[in-house]
Amino acid sequence: ASIAKTAVGHLAATARESFASANNDLIKGKQWLSTLDNRTTPQCRIRDRLKYTLNNKPVGHSVPYLQGPGKIHFCCRSTETFILKSAKELGIDVRDISPAERASMDGVVAGDTTYREWFLRQPYTRQKQIVGESRAKLIRDGGMSPDEFYTDKGEWLTLKQLRERDAQVFRKAGI
């Protein structure tokens, strides 16, 4: 089943690439969408809602696209949505549509909710399931942000690397 899921995700990502290429007159970029639950990988959590050009270049951040959603790791459940050119960019005089909603394991959330925002609203027990007890303590008791668990290139830091960066936050969290 895992191999089939991975193959389907890879095929879907390849189809999206072909679609975007064929419609680049309407599409100005893409946005990574990660599944909002406790099984989402660190690689996908950091990339949730990040924008990229159609050539996979970061827009407003430095986290690389790598292989992209559906291809970045085995059993990847992330996807991407296309960012359409605005009506104004297309020469049409109408009001733009606001973002809608997106799904999470708890039901519908606002369409512009990022994984980070969703994560920070979760109870401590769920945060512990997602990032582990030490990292959950670093957030709750040490005052760390989930974003601090990554390099500026989106690489997941080990606890040892985090401690080397800021031992004080570990003491504050009682770790």
Predicted region positions:
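Domain-core detector
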Residues: 1-73, 82-175
